[in-house]
Amino acid sequence: MLKNLFYICLLLLFCNKSEAQNLSSIIDSCHYYLEKQDAMSFNKTYIRILDAYEKEYDAELYSIEEELKEMRIEDQSIRLLLLDASKKKQNVNKIRRIMDDIDRRNAVRVAEIIDQYGWLSPDDIGYEANEALFLCIQHSQDSLIQNKYLPILKEAVRDGAAKGWQYAFLTDRCLMNQGQKQIYGTQRITRDGVDYLVPLQDIDKVDSLRKEIGLEPLSEYMKDCGLKTGWSKEFYKNNIKQHESIFNSWFQSFKRNKNSY
């Protein structure tokens, strides 16, 4: 409790009474509840101080954070809907078209944000908004956008503004969308309800590369993806021609769809 009071006092020292009326009213309420010994109301109120402070004193970043959080909700919600539609075999193409529109719009906006502010860290905008930067670039169908921001993401990882696994996923996605073999084994293709790994550059080195970037072994990843049958390096090596054929077919379809936009 004393620690909370200390932070409240700090905010009071730095806040101008002519500004931040909302913040000021929240702080006044905290003092009122303390005097009334209303611990429940105090606990519900003091945790609103940081949000109010950011909204009033970092209004620009606060607005960006809220916008990115909304884009993250869009990005993930439409994918959950597509997953359900695929299971039910209902409205899949309609939902996919909606998802593509969302992805294009979000990628363009996130590109604008990164160009203006750089790759904002969780300390700048919170974890959800920070994740939205990655998701919207990752899910873009525009290879130019993905390739442009891949080195920026790499720098963000180095600076602690993004996660290593995000760099691995975007690296593999960029390669996949160019018809090339992936490095980290993060990308899969689903055909008739069966997952196939996009061909790898080096199956024997993939686990050590994944470990360097903070990812679990590939066999564990494939298991977590919900494969009904076991997966192993030997399985992959024995079926590499099938994986390559399925990937080549996917890539040709991807190029046709891309050219139709």
Regions found by a protein language model. Give the residues of each.
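Surface-exposed, interaction-prone regions with an acidic/low-complexity signature
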Residues: 38, 42, 56, 105, ...
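Bacterial Sec-dependent N-terminal signal peptides
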Residues: 1-26, 261
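Stable alpha-helical elements in mature extracytoplasmic
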Residues: 26, 106-109, 149, 202-209
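Betabetaalpha-Me/HNH-type nuclease active-site subdomain
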Residues: 181-210, 221-224
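Surface-exposed, polar/charged faces of alpha-helical domains
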Residues: 90, 101, 105, 116-119, ...
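Extended amphipathic alpha-helical interaction segments
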Residues: 112-123, 129-187
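A cross-kingdom marker for long, charged
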Residues: 205-261
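Preference for long, solvent-exposed alpha-helical segments and helix-linker "stalks"
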Residues: 21-129, 137-144
